[in-house]
Amino acid sequence: MLMRDENAKVMMLMPVDSTKHFQARVYWNKYSRETYIDILSLPDPGEGKQYQLWALTAGNPVDAGIFILPNDAGMQRLKNIIEADQWAVTIEPTGGSLNPSLDQMILISKNS
């Protein structure tokens, strides 16, 4: 199980806007490249919008996948990621974007 795997990193994502109480956790294994997200608190992104996770390496974003707000979904498996120094979540049009909408960044992790 990824949470108990000693090779898995757990990264806490905190709100970009410190007045908000949004949170998520990313579980990432750099060897198997598996990536999961566990949503702790996020609002509905709005009509025609969806959340997207980004892996950041030297400031360059890589699409880690789009995800839905959980009802009973628990952790959601996203794309395999080769390398990441940091993680971010943006609100994007449904289906995701090739590049992050930086003005719509809602969560970010500290550097790993």
Task: Give the positions of each predicted feature.
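N-terminal targeting/export leaders
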Residues: 1-112
